[in-house]
């Protein structure tokens, strides 16, 4: 069985790739360059994780997105919310809009679908999850359902996108990742990279962007030792 894993190098996609590995899929990973500030670190993480999982990694250039994106992920204008803001819907929605890249997931998953069909893979594994689905419309079960509906008409082999984390929040994802590492006797999570910024030291996170703050909270609430290095703890 073949599968494509959309692997940004972040915690969610790293754990999703572990899920695919645990289900005995022959994995190929794809990582996208959409002109994001953290590109270099994401590629390093994705390639390291792919190596550990014995998977080929392909970096796909969709840098044209940067030409029309006003996202902080492209411009470097990264919001830094307070801890208490993470569960405030209005403030989280504002932060979401500041980092929203136009149609990013639609573009990435469409390309991944073509890749999957081309190598006769039956599934695309994505790291879409419950916590991000609260504010990001392209992380919701409705998005997954309707995207798969389009694949019924857009691909001959009717490849399907799956999101094994779609019912999980970040602490649950961290916990699942640790369980899968123990089950598979692999070490992946410490090489994942969630930060919105491109810090000079490999795998070093800023600790102040929303993604870093959610990562910190995930390990803390899961009761798991956080292997991440942060500039600001």
UniProtKB/Swiss-Prot annotation:
It catalyses: 7-carboxy-7-deazaguanine + NH4(+) + ATP = 7-cyano-7-deazaguanine + ADP + phosphate + H2O + H(+). Pathway: Purine metabolism; 7-cyano-7-deazaguanine biosynthesis. Gene3D superfamilies: HUPs (3.40.50.620). SUPFAM superfamilies: Adenine nucleotide alpha hydrolases-like (SSF52402). Its cofactor is Zn(2+). Belongs to the QueC family. ATP binds at residues 7-17. Zn(2+) binds at residues 195, 206, 209, 212. GO terms for molecular function: ATP binding; ligase activity, forming carbon-nitrogen bonds; zinc ion binding. Its EC number is 6.3.4.20. This is 7-cyano-7-deazaguanine synthase. Catalyzes the ATP-dependent conversion of 7-carboxy-7-deazaguanine (CDG) to 7-cyano-7-deazaguanine (preQ(0)). Keywords: ATP-binding, Ligase, Metal-binding, Nucleotide-binding, Zinc. Binds 1 zinc ion per subunit. It comes from Methanococcus maripaludis (strain C6 / ATCC BAA-1332). The keyword Transferase does not apply.
């Amino acid at each position: 069985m073949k599968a494509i894993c959309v692997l940004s190098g972040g915690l969610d996609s790293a754990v999703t790739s572990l899920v695919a590995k645990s289900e005995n899929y022959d994995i190929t990973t794809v990582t996208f360059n959409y002109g994001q500030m953290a590109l270099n670190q994401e590629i390093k993480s994705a390639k390291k994780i792919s190596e550990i999982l014995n998977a080929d990694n392909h970096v796909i250039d969709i840098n044209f997105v940067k030409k029309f994106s006003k996202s902080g992920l492209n411009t470097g204008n990264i919001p830094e919310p307070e801890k208490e803001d993470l569960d405030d819907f209005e403030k989280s929605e504002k932060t979401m809009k500041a980092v929203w890249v136009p149609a990013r997931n639609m573009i990435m998953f469409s390309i991944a679908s073509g890749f999957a069909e081309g190598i006769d893979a039956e599934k695309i594994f994505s790291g879409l999850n419950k916590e991000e689905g609260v504010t990001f419309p392209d992380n919701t079960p409705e998005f997954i359902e309707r995207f798969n509906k389009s694949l019924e008409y857009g691909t001959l082999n009717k490849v399907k996108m799956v999101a094994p984390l779609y019912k999980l929040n970040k602490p649950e994802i961290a916990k699942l990742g640790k369980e899968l590492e123990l089950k598979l006797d692999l070490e992946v999570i410490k090489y994942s990279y969630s930060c919105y910024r491109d810090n000079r030291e490999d795998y070093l996170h800023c600790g102040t962007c929303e993604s870093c703050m959610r990562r910190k909270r995930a390990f803390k609430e899961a009761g798991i030792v956080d292997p991440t290095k942060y500039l600001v703890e």
